[in-house]
Regions:
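Repeated loop/turn-to-beta-strand initiation elements of outer-membrane beta-barrel proteins
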Residues: 20, 57-61, 120-123, 171-174, ...
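Transmembrane beta-barrel strands of outer-membrane/channel proteins
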Residues: 24-30, 63-69, 125-127, 176-180, ...
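Surface-exposed strand-loop-strand hairpins of Gram-negative outer-membrane beta-barrel proteins
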Residues: 30-45
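Residues that define the transmembrane beta-barrel architecture of outer-membrane proteins
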Residues: 41-45, 105-110, 156-160, 185-189, ...
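Outer-membrane beta-barrel architecture
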Residues: 48-50, 112-115, 163-165, 192-194, ...
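Outer membrane beta-barrel
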Residues: 57-172, 194-195, 368
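Detector for outer-membrane/organellar transmembrane beta-barrel domains
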Residues: 235-335
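Outer-membrane beta-barrel "beta-signal"
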Residues: 318, 322, 351, 357-358, ...
């Protein structure tokens, strides 16, 4: 019933004024993960509907609806995902061995926006994709999103905002972004400029917003938010030299009542003559602790909630891809936490079984001490099928 009302509310206005395009995909995934000597089987079925209408003079409408239903193990013990040194001093004296949480089915409006076209630029209003930066696995400039290391390019949830894009000249433009909060002080404000120079693009960004970070009271076990006034200034460069793609991205963040910090990323990619593709990145997050023994439970909660880009400071990410045929490719995703010396190897296979159907297989093997970020997990596997329509 809820879906019918939501779908009708999106579809009827577009049908009144003209033709609407409806497309999307169905995705089914099964996963297994072994962590802290416990195995979890789980998965989901997901339907994504995309609505697009560009038949209005000077305007375009777009929306996405996601319906996702989980199966298998939908109730988890959160303490399995923390090293014993992190949770035992807090929970064991109270006789607590489990901190359960459940994964709930979802039905939500991922994006819904109108884009207005003017002679001097475009204005986009509504819940929209705002993804900043040039990095593949991390983006120091992006204060709206965090990425999954096993799937950095997976779609991100839209941001409620107001965006003005003004082209200044060829290969140069300025963006103004506002994401409303409870008042002006708690709203996110950003200005981004982009300039193309020969084989390179230069990006400059400034912004300010209220940074919410989870804080668990260890006496009452009630969650609350720590609000930090954050101002960010940064930039990025992306281009190509001798067939090698190179990029860099950085941001300096000033915080009221907290220590300022820097985030940096550098990367490159290259495709060999035989079709082998390689990408590598190094990332530094000055806001995260440098050593494992400086972590506490709140650091883990903030990372799991997507409130920080990384758990510790220094990371590498490497991906290899090779086409075996027009329909089958193999690859490897490797990432490492240089701060605690843990890492993961994730071989994968992608099969385009039919014209609009792909099936992927992934296996993950994790290395490091049991109290490290990736060493805590033993192995995982994933099978994903996606069919477009």
């Amino acid at each position: 019933m809820k879906f019918s009302c939501l779908f009708s509310a999106l579809l009827i206005p577009a049908l009144v004024v003209g033709q609407v395009d409806i497309f999307g995909y169905f995705e089914s995934e099964f996963d297994h993960i072994t962590v802290s000597d416990r195995g979890y089987n789980y998965g989901y079925n997901k339907l994504r509907l995309d609505l697009d209408h560009s038949g209005i003079d000077g305007a375009a409408f777009g929306a996405n609806v996601n319906i996702q239903r989980y199966y298998g193990n939908v109730k988890w013990n959160m303490l399995d995902f923390f090293p014993n040194e992190i949770w035992e001093p807090i929970f064991q004296p109270l006789g607590i061995e489990e901190f359960p949480f459940a994964v709930a089915d979802t039905l939500y409006l991922d994006n819904a926006y109108v884009r207005l076209h003017f002679n001097k630029g475009d204005v986009t209003i509504g819940k929209q994709q705002i993804s900043l930066g040039v990095g593949y696995a991390w983006n120091p400039l992006d204060i709206f999103n965090t990425k999954l290391l096993l799937d950095p390019t997976y779609e991100q949830t839209g941001v409620n905002g107001f965006r003005i894009e003004i082209p200044v000249k060829d290969r140069a433009n300025v963006d103004f972004i506002i994401s409303p909060g409870s008042d002006w002080k708690n709203s996110t404000k950003m200005i981004t400029g982009k300039l193309g120079l020969r084989r390179f693009d230069l990006i400059g960004t400034i912004g300010s917003y209220n940074w919410k970070r989870t804080q668990l009271d260890f006496q009452t076990f009630q969650s609350q938010y720590l609000n930090l006034e954050r101002r960010m200034a940064g930039g990025a460069i992306v281009g190509e030299i001798g067939g090698i793609g190179i990029w860099g991205e950085g941001a300096y963040n000033t915080l009221k009542d907290a220590e300022n910090y820097t985030e940096l990323l550098v990367g490159f990619d290259y495709t060999f003559e035989n079709g082998l593709y390689c990408l590598a990145e190094f990332y530094h997050n000055g806001n995260s602790p440098e050593k494992f023994n400086a972590l506490d439970l709140n650091n883990y909660l903030q990372y799991l909630n997507g409130e920080t880009h990384s758990l510790l400071q220094n990371y590498t990410f490497i991906i290899w891809q090779y086409p075996l045929s027009d329909f089958v490719s193999i690859g490897m995703i490797n990432f490492a936490n240089l701060s605690d010396k843990s890492a993961a190897l994730n071989p994968q296979l992608e099969w385009n079984a039919f014209e609009d159907v792909s099936i992927s297989f992934l296996f993950g093997y994790y290395m490091g001490a049991e109290n490290t970020e990736f060493g805590l997990q033993e192995w995982n596997g994933r099978i994903r099928m996606r069919a477009y329509f």
